[in-house]
Amino acid sequence: DGGQSWKTISPDLTRGLPETIKSSGGPITQDNTGAEFYSNLFAINESPIEKGVIWVGSDDGLIHVTTDNGETWKNVTPPPTLSPKLNMINCIDPSPFKKGTVYVAATSYKFGDYKPYLYKTNDYGKTWSLITKGIPQNYYSRAIRSDKVREGLLYAGTEWGMFISFDDGNSWKPFQLNLPITSIRDLHVRDNDLIAATHGRSFW
């Protein structure tokens, strides 16, 4: 109804760790930025080809999926061998071509880990693969999007620029062109255009 009324469709889909949601700073003066708090849902996206399939990622490292429009949820977080515990799930992009396929961009730079974390699953999160070949290991990832026309064409935004993949993430190449060297915070594919949102250097 256009946002006139709302209903809850999930339980808490975060880790809810007490040590990450307490007040920071002090002991006399507390921080008031809010940036240090965790246990937030940070990314959500629905499948463009499957009704009722919704993916959710939290800023404390969890990924959940529902296949029945929120009636039930399944924790499909990548294993610790692939994803740090408190990996911030920045971006979730379900495939417009394959059911059960989703691409994820995550980051763990707040813990001194500057590696890119881009993931792909083809089976609703039962198994995951890390897809970062060709991206420098200090270019931590911010966003990943799939092309809506050409299957296997992916775009990735990192802290230091753009990358492109023509083989469904198996390999990446720089796609900087005339973009400024800055953080690519999000990407949007619209018709025949790719839109990039940067940190402090405008839209492109």
Place the predicted regions along the sequence by residue:
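Beta-propeller blade termini and top-face loops
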Residues: 1-204
